[in-house]
């Protein structure tokens, strides 16, 4: 039994709501290797230039030095840990959860949410629609990384990053299975 087969054994204990590795959808198929699909998404994100940029960014902005203000990298790692713990308790795919958590803030602009609010006002004023960091995160991963080629993450990982605050906007919160066609329509 190889590494991938051992890692995928845990899928037999997944909840019916969990996404299995074989359900992974990519715009460009990958050659098989020893890692499960969503684990590969984790690797692609942590080796991306966008993720490296987390290194020296603060999660919140302060005009004073403050040791209690964490770096965005620490925030993302804490979100990942908490999300995986919840995912484990609910018998979900922890690799998919980790990939989404690690990529969820890649599209943040300088000055965090306040910078996003300012850009949103400017964008709306010029009839360009809303400016949302989650949309920018997906754009970064699909259209900017790798000299504009993107890093070919699974549609499920991209969808989780895109919708990471969807319950706030839609005022609902429940799992919804999607077909391949529904996933791809979201990205046209």
Provide a role label for each language-model segment.
Residues 26-33, 37-47, 51-74, 175-185:
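Active-site flanking loop/helix segments enriched in acidic
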Residues 64-96:
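Alpha-helical phosphate/pyrophosphate-handling elements in metalloenzyme active cores
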Residues 34, 68-76, 107-108, 126-130:
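Short secondary-structure transition/capping motifs
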Residues 2-30, 48-52, 81, 89, ...:
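Sequence-structural signature of the catalytic-core scaffold of metal-dependent phosphohydrolases
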Residues 98-103, 107:
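Short alpha-helix carrying the canonical HExxH Zn2+-binding catalytic motif
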